[in-house]
């Protein structure tokens, strides 16, 4: 692709989900220049996921002129510890305890911004989607896991532990299925994709 100058502003976004990973390259006006979706290799572990993300970023960046600049952001199904920068609270548990941000920056040689995927989704809806114009927006993600984000006055409210909107780990059944967070009967164990799949297996002995 060609650009009008050597400093062509663009943005690469990665949605790192429990089931799939998607890469998107946007021009300055928001036009989609590149989109790719691949399975998240979480059964293969952290290094495989790291390689998958880095490879997809390189694919997207290859669509730009060699001298073009871009920003890079990644939404993850968890959060980064504000003290040590390690991943925590992730439903893809192989990410937990790893320095995803610094590892990707080392592999790519490029600054990386990492945020909770539900927070990213909620902020987008707040500023340019269904929540535009509202003072308080609560966004819900229901996929492999079950996440949530809160925006007030156009800003994400993460809370001191960066999990303010994470409604998926409220226990609604103390005797329910065990969750990876060590609690029982979390909302996520009941209505997320993985929760529904597990419930079907318990009841019918078959995998969806």
Report each predicted region and the residues it spans.
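A secondary-structure boundary/capping signal
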Residues: 75-76, 91, 142, 192
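Hydrophobic "anchor" residues
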Residues: 31-32, 80, 87, 156-157
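Conserved phosphate-binding loops in N-terminal lobes of ATP-dependent enzymes
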Residues: 6-76
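Conserved A3 ("GATE") glycine/threonine-rich loop of ANL adenylate-forming enzymes
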Residues: 19-20, 120, 144-147
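Glycine/GP-enriched mid-protein hinge/lid loop-to-helix segment characteristic of carbohydrate kinases
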Residues: 2-10, 24-27, 34-36, 44-48, ...
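Glycine-rich phosphate-binding loop and adjoining helix at the ATP-binding site
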Residues: 46-54, 58, 62, 68-72, ...
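Residue-level recognition of specific faces of alpha-helices
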Residues: 22, 73, 79, 120, ...
């Amino acid at each position: 692709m060609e650009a009008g100058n050597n400093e062509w502003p663009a943005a690469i976004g990665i949605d790192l989900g429990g089931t799939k990973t998607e890469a998107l390259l946007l021009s300055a006006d928001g036009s989609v220049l590149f989109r790719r979706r691949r399975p998240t290799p979480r059964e293969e572990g952290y290094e495989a996921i790291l390689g998958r993300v880095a490879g997809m970023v390189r694919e997207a960046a290859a669509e730009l002129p060699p001298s073009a600049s871009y920003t890079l952001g990644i939404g993850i199904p968890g959060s980064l510890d504000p003290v040590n920068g390690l991943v925590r609270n992730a439903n893809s548990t192989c990410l937990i305890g790893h320095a995803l941000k610094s590892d990707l920056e080392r592999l790519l040689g490029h600054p990386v911004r990492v945020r909770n995927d539900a927070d990213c989704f909620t902020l987008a809806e707040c500023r340019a989607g269904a929540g535009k114009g509202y003072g308080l927006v609560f966004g819900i993600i229901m996929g492999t896991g079950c996440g949530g984000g809160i925006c007030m006055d156009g800003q994400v409210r993460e809370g001191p532990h960066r999990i303010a909107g994470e409604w998926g780990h409220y226990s609604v059944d103390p005797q329910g299925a065990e969750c990876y967070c060590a609690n029982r009967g979390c909302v996520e164990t009941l209505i997320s994709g993985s929760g529904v799949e597990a419930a079907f297996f318990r009841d019918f002995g078959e995998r969806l």
